């Protein structure tokens, strides 16, 4: 019935000729304010036809709800109470911390070799060709890896693609940084392609990102980041990088976001579990968790530079 309408914002939506369909709850409230009777219809109207037309109009409104929501002003967010948690039975949410670690370690992509020919000197063109070919082949494996990240395949195909589109360069970069931890001052793009910053200089503008990647690898080394922590961080990048750029605020989209947040909580709990197992005190665990998550903002910054 009409009383079931719920304003997804603050019950103060603007209802005028152009925006009367944007929020049924506020539209109904405005009707009451100007004298419409609750629980009935005005006696001076022929009820049957009015109700029939109203029902048809509401069905049409509901069909267009997705498009309508996208036209709303950005600060009108649907209420969390509207989310039904229809993905709460996702297998990912019932995994233990150890099971998540095992799944992520098993999901790790295979090693990819570059087509580097040591007999040919680097030029800007040859370096870019090498790196883009390498990235292309890594991206194929990245898709298979993402499908094995707990909770990822529970999302719609559209949202899986969206998250990968947002995060692919950050994921490539964290993999590069992780591989390079044992090579101070160098970046290990592939087992047969280890570059120092002087070689990086041959691509215009590349040395700035090169230095940032080296600094991040140095931070990983200084913190003694473990492989289990690395796979958790990489999964967090996949799930988190695109979560705030979903195009719509429809209920379906909100349920997807809610699911992602729940999986992210599981992965963060897994990181804390790993730290507790390593013997860190509660305070040390929280500090290390914060330090690891702070590093992720640098990957976002580097990927924005790299685009």
Swiss-Prot record:
DNA-binding region range list: 1-43
GO molecular function, one term: zinc ion binding
Name of the protein this chain belongs to: Estrogen receptor
Organism of provenance: Aspidoscelis uniparens
CDD domains found in the cross-reference section: NR_LBD_ER
Keyword Cytoplasm part of the UniProt annotation: no
Function noted in UniProt: The steroid hormones and their receptors are involved in the regulation of eukaryotic gene expression and affect cellular proliferation and differentiation in target tissues.
GO CC list: nucleus
PANTHER family with a match to the protein in the record: KNIRPS-RELATED PROTEIN-RELATED
Spans through the membrane: none
Record key words, sorted: DNA-binding, Lipid-binding, Metal-binding, Nucleus, Receptor, Steroid-binding, Transcription, Transcription regulation, Zinc, Zinc-finger
